[in-house]
């Protein structure tokens, strides 16, 4: 069975997320642990956490298919010490929110070096992760590949490997692969040999067992455009046929697919249906 869902709103409470996930045809989800555009974050109350866990059990959502995503302001690669420290402090709180809710994974973008260079940025990210991980417990940080634009670190998977090499608690770091970001950075998943090359690179750098989530997004721009614009499934330059190639790999099927496509719950329900239609149309075998 395919594990699929979307980034879900928390405006009506954490406890609404499991049911809303089922309602859009999903069995997996990602959420922000707080207002993503704020440096402020607070732990959920005991009652909120209990309700959330009860709804998870009621709707039979596997904890391996539940993810949090860090806030937009976090930048562990920042050369500005105040921003770096605020990012570290916020990530610590986000980890604690995950722990209280029972969510095992916190996804982050590595960050932007803001012109100071990749090596310095990678060192700052690793220093920040060590500060976070050495002062928290349990939750696994997922490093996401990003688009090749600005001073972003992580547009090559090798960047993520260099970060992990500098992290003390390597067992608490894994990766997320974003299909739009990868396509935007030159990883062509529309061809069999492109997917084979990608999976081989992941295996050689990290081991495929470290791939915990796929952000399933089409791309509004062509291969290698470095624009970072997500598109609805099948409506972008990856397209139905391209996703059919990607979906056909068993290594891809074993990982939860989380939509971050434009729109809200209604559009995400349509995109989940579109994924099913692609699987059926191209007669893709699913375990």
UniProtKB/Swiss-Prot annotation:
Zn(2+) 1 binds at residues 69, 109, 144. One of its GO terms (molecular function) is zinc ion binding. PROSITE patterns: AP_NUCLEASE_F2_2, AP_NUCLEASE_F2_3, AP_NUCLEASE_F2_4. InterPro entries: AP_endonuc_2, AP_endonuc_F2_Zn_BS, Xyl_isomerase-like_sf, Xyl_isomerase-like_TIM-brl. It comes from the Bacteria. Zn(2+) 2 binds at residues 144, 178, 215, 260. It catalyses: Endonucleolytic cleavage to 5'-phosphooligonucleotide end-products. Binds 3 Zn(2+) ions. Zn(2+) 3 binds at residues 181, 228, 230. This is Probable endonuclease 4.
């Amino acid at each position: 069975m395919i594990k699929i869902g979307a980034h879900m709103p928390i405006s009506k409470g954490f406890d609404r997320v499991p049911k809303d996930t089922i309602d859009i045809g999903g069995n997996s989800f990602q959420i922000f642990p707080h207002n993503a555009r704020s440096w402020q974050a607070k732990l959920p109350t005991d009652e909120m956490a209990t309700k959330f866990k009860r709804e998870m059990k009621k709707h039979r959502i596997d904890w391996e298919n539940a993810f949090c995503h860090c806030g937009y302001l976090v930048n562990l690669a920042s050369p500005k010490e105040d921003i770096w420290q605020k990012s570290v402090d916020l990530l610590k709180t986000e980890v604690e929110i995950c722990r209280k809710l029972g969510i095992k994974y916190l996804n982050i973008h590595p960050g932007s070096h803001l012109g100071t260079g990749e090596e310095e940025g990678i060192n700052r990210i690793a220093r920040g992760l060590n500060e976070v991980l050495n002062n928290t417990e349990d939750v696994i940080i997922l490093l996401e590949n990003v688009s090749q634009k600005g001073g972003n670190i992580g547009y090559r998977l090798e960047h993520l490997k260099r970060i992990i090499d500098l992290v003390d608690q390597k067992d608490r770091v894994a990766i997320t692969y974003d299909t739009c970001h990868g396509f935007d950075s030159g990883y062509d998943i529309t061809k069999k040999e492109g997917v084979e090359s990608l999976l081989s690179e992941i295996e050689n750098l990290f081991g495929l067992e470290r791939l915990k989530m796929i952000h399933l997004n089409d791309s509004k721009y062509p291969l290698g455009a470095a624009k970072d614009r997500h598109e609805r499934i099948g409506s972008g330059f990856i397209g139905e046929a391209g996703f059919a190639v990607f979906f056909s790999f068993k290594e891809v099927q074993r990982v939860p697919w989380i939509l971050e496509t434009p729109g809200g719950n209604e559009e995400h329900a349509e995109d989940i249906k579109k994924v099913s239609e692609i699987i059926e149309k191209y007669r893709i075998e699913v375990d």
